[in-house]
Swiss-Prot record:
GO cellular component: cytoplasm
Enzyme nomenclature, EC number: 2.4.2.17
Free-text activity regulation comment from the record: Feedback inhibited by histidine.
Gene symbol of the encoding locus: hisG
Chief localization: cytoplasm
Protein name stated in the entry: ATP phosphoribosyltransferase
Alphabetical GO biological process terms: L-histidine biosynthetic process
Pathway as given in its UniProt record: Amino-acid biosynthesis; L-histidine biosynthesis; L-histidine from 5-phospho-alpha-D-ribose 1-diphosphate: step 1/9
GO molecular function: ATP binding; ATP phosphoribosyltransferase activity; magnesium ion binding
Originating species: Vibrio vulnificus (strain YJ016)
Record function comment: Catalyzes the condensation of ATP and 5-phosphoribose 1-diphosphate to form N'-(5'-phosphoribosyl)-ATP (PR-ATP). Has a crucial role in the pathway because the rate of histidine biosynthesis seems to be controlled primarily by regulation of HisG enzymatic activity.
InterPro entries per UniProt: ATP-PRT_HisG_long, ATP_PRibTrfase_cat, ATP_PRibTrfase_CS, ATP_PRibTrfase_HisG, HisG_C, N-reg_PII-like_a/b, N-reg_PII/ATP_PRibTrfase_C
Length: 298
């Protein structure tokens, strides 16, 4: 099903949904999500947002129903493996791995149990919401096991006598600890990613995708970068430049009232730590400012 408007699928609710909406708004896409609507139309671009369950997004992309989708790599790979196993279409293209939505899929066991490696899991019953990812990992390790498929509250399975171990998403490990479990093996690392359907796009739609990608890259670069400004004595300029963590040479400008000092400006992809600022001050630098960058385009 093809339309003239760019169709983008995002998760209906949750932290990933909020991050994706924020990213699109920073890219200049205006929209207003109200109530329980499935489709939201952009106010200033030919873009429609489809608000759906996260595990529906890969299928919508692979079946060509929508053009782009924001999805966690864990969900994407689980659906891809499932479709591959059943012979269904599983083609897509990855456009950009994003800098949010980070988590890991890990096997966790009883906190008092000794663990020497994957072979210790042989013959165990493992509860999970990600049976395909778990099977792929265990097959690579050559370890036989059985699956207990659960769609929620996986962490309580061992305590309830449903399983010997679990494979679940972990961010901080606090939930595992609260349920008497410990992380034993990381089997998949995940971040949010932007994917698109396979096949060609109309010229205007392809141009819009490229524009969005350029803006997204700019937003992510800006988030990782700082704008640094300071005044420096001319005779210490080279020493000061050596301390500054810029990717390119800084801009050096004369000061109107002082001939022996200059203004130094640069964009840095690294933070300027207090220790570095103190070293700069010892060399005679003053008016040191470290500012966030809202937008950036190289």
């Amino acid at each position: 099903m093809q339309t003239q408007r760019l169709r983008i699928a995002i998760q209906k609710k949750g932290r990933l949904s909020e991050e994706c909406q924020g990213l699109l708004k920073k890219c200049g896409v205006k929209f207003n999500i109200m109530g329980e609507r499935l489709v939201v139309h952009s106010e200033n671009m030919p873009i429609d947002l489809l608000l759906v369950r996260d595990d529906d997004i890969p299928g919508l992309i692979m079946d060509g129903v929508v053009d782009l989708g924001f999805i966690g790599e864990n969900v994407l790979e689980e659906v891809r493996l499932e479709r591959k196993a059943t012979g269904d279409a599983c083609q897509f293209e990855t456009l950009s791995r994003l800098d949010f939505g980070g988590c890991r899929l890990s096997i966790a066991i009883d906190k008092d149990e000794k663990y020497n490696g994957p072979q210790d899991l042989a013959g165990k019953r493992i509860a999970t919401t990600y049976p395909q990812l778990l099977k792929a990992y265990m097959d690579r390790q050559g370890v036989p096991f059985s699956t207990c498929m659960l769609t929620g509250s996986v962490e309580v399975a061992p305590r309830a006598g449903l399983a010997d171990a679990i494979a679940d998403l972990v961010s901080t490990g606090a939930t595992l600890e609260a349920n008497g479990l410990k992380e034993a093996e990381v089997i998949f690392q995940s971040k949010a990613t932007l994917i698109q359907r396979s096949g060609e796009f109309a010229q205007d739609k392809q141009a819009l995708i490229e524009k969005l990608l350029t803006r997204m890259q700019g937003v992510q670069q800006a988030k990782e970068s700082k704008y640094i400004m300071l005044h420096a004595p001319v005779d210490k300029l080279e020493q000061i430049k050596a301390l500054l963590p810029g990717a390119e040479d800084p801009t050096v400008l004369p000061l109107s009232a002082e001939k022996q000092r200059v203004a130094v400006h640069l964009v840095s992809t690294e933070n300027l730590f207090w220790e570095t600022m103190e070293q700069l001050k010892e060399l005679g630098a003053s008016s040191i400012l470290v500012l966030p960058i809202e937008k950036m385009m190289e």
